[in-house]
Amino acid sequence: MVNASVTGIGSMESARRVVEALIRGGVQHVVVSPGSRNAPLVYALAEAQQAIHVVVRIDERSAGFTALGLAIGSSSPVAVLTTSGTAVGNLLPAVMEADHAGVPLLVLSADRPEELRGTGANQTTDQIDLFGSHVRFAADVAAGDLPEPAVRTGLDAALGRLDGVATGPVQLNFAFRDPLTPALDGSDFRPLKSSQPVDAAIETIIPQHQESEHRYQTVVLAGHGAGPQAELFARRHGLPLLAEPSSNARFGPNAVGPYRLLLEHFEALIERVVIFGRPTLSRPVAALMNRADLPRALYLPRPATWFEEGKRSEQIISDWAALSEFTGSGSASWLEIWLAAQIQAEAALDDALGEELSGLRLARELWGSSENLVIGSSNPIRDADLAGRPRSESPRVHANRGLAGIDGTISTATGIALATARPTRLLVGDLTFLHDVGGLLLPRGEQVPDLQIVVLNDSGGGIFTLLEHGTLGDEPAYQAAVERYFGTAHDAELASLAAAYGLEYQLVSSTEQLVEMLQAPVSGRSVLEIRTERTALRGLHDRVRAAISAALTI
């Protein structure tokens, strides 16, 4: 028998307290998916629309990744609100990415009160600890309880303010009893115009320089999330900087271009390795990081979820001065041979690419012409890593490299474009585009970002062509299997999909046309499609490798 006695505050009062606590805690954006059980929070957000930015998405999976993009773009915590049931489960992919990427994503899940759980009530399941170890903190706020303590603790956990806890996602599960709406005559409307927020930005650590007396032939590796401090460190110590695109350190006088091919020639000369962020893109870099004969140091100034103590062989250093002492300063000749080799390699790369409209040429042109760039997983991020020529100042580059999935990329880019309020370009393959094509759906009246989606369409999974599967696919016994299970060819019409969601569309058929299109400003939403053949990929990469190898005289 259900206990009819209820105590504590009502659902609308609880929801208003949640929203005010979020705003005071520095939350600037909330993504909402419609539902009934989360209605109290929806109405509370509507009352606070002058104090907080609310985005509406129909699909919860897209909502989760949109919130992820908003958090990445704003460098601040962002909440995503769903109703109960499977709606919450649809957030799991975004939560997993936020976990491994260290993004402060707050899941606000609505739930039935305790007396309705386990009774067969509609749309009711066990939502507590649904995300397991992927969240830093999870709280079940009972119906009628004051929600502020859970919100404050959740924000502290999401921002890494708790001892030993890395920045990342949290879940706040709010149980609401009927009534789930304000007074139906409108008399209960309580607008929240403003609330003094605290500073909830994610801190960037830029320590003071410490000169070292030692000299080593050290290289600085900058992986995802390294930030501009990696460039600063390499420049101050006179060292070559090998930076992945989403490190946001691939710029400045020490940055080296197609470094993964140069490593084949210079690896034996390297005496020490310093790692910022999390490099994941190439096997030559992975091999260098795992060389037991080399002293290697991983700079880790704060806890990181992708690192477990005792699981990696590098020396872990959290202090800038100690890192400087380990690294030493590079000799002028050490840096010069890398930079000279880069000049030769870049020229050889241009010659090898020619005027052919390939993924590498596309990435090279995009890197040089974009200021706010989102890059999808699989081949696009690796094309940018090989072909993106370092600039004097880095474009702002974003990528979902926490778990490096292809899901949710359009939604993530949409969130980034909204948060930064800057024209944004997204580079993706066709499968990544199709996987999140639902992310193009904006409810009528929602803010439209300035987002240009550049799709490299090779009708399937091109990355497998460059892996061992490509070699196996040449064998008659496996050719059909490799094409079916890894190639996954399709006949999707991207122009029709773009039209269905109200985006402008252009098929780009030449490098000259591509350059012209990239010179035009990004306004509203559009799709540029570039069609290539997967079968040509291995040959192109072989030509590039051979051309660079032949050009090096250092």
From Swiss-Prot:
GO terms for biological process: menaquinone biosynthetic process. Its EC number is 2.2.1.9. It is an enzyme of class 2 (transferase). Its cofactor is Mg(2+); Mn(2+); thiamine diphosphate. Pathway: Quinol/quinone metabolism; 1,4-dihydroxy-2-naphthoate biosynthesis; 1,4-dihydroxy-2-naphthoate from chorismate: step 2/7; Quinol/quinone metabolism; menaquinone biosynthesis. Binds 1 thiamine pyrophosphate per subunit. Keywords: Magnesium, Manganese, Menaquinone biosynthesis, Metal-binding, Thiamine pyrophosphate, Transferase. It catalyses: isochorismate + 2-oxoglutarate + H(+) = 5-enolpyruvoyl-6-hydroxy-2-succinyl-cyclohex-3-ene-1-carboxylate + CO2. InterPro entries: MenaQ_synth_MenD, THDP-binding, Thiamin_PyroP_enz_TPP-bd_dom, TPP_enzyme_TPP-bd. Gene3D superfamilies: 3.40.50.970, TPP-binding domain. SUPFAM superfamilies: Thiamin diphosphate-binding fold (THDP-binding) (SSF52518). GO terms for molecular function: 2-succinyl-5-enolpyruvyl-6-hydroxy-3-cyclohexene-1-carboxylic-acid synthase activity; magnesium ion binding; manganese ion binding; thiamine pyrophosphate binding. Pfam families: TPP_enzyme_C (PF02775), TPP_enzyme_N (PF02776). It comes from the Bacteria. PANTHER family: 2-SUCCINYL-5-ENOLPYRUVYL-6-HYDROXY-3-CYCLOHEXENE-1-CARBOXYLATE SYNTHASE, PROTEIN PHYLLO, CHLOROPLASTIC. Belongs to the TPP enzyme family. MenD subfamily. Catalyzes the thiamine diphosphate-dependent decarboxylation of 2-oxoglutarate and the subsequent addition of the resulting succinic semialdehyde-thiamine pyrophosphate anion to isochorismate to yield 2-succinyl-5-enolpyruvyl-6-hydroxy-3-cyclohexene-1-carboxylate (SEPHCHC). HAMAP family: MenD. NCBIfam families: menD (TIGR00173). Homodimer. This is 2-succinyl-5-enolpyruvyl-6-hydroxy-3-cyclohexene-1-carboxylate synthase. It comes from Renibacterium salmoninarum (strain ATCC 33209 / DSM 20767 / JCM 11484 / NBRC 15589 / NCIMB 2235). The lineage of its organism: Bacteria, Bacillati, Actinomycetota, Actinomycetes, Micrococcales.
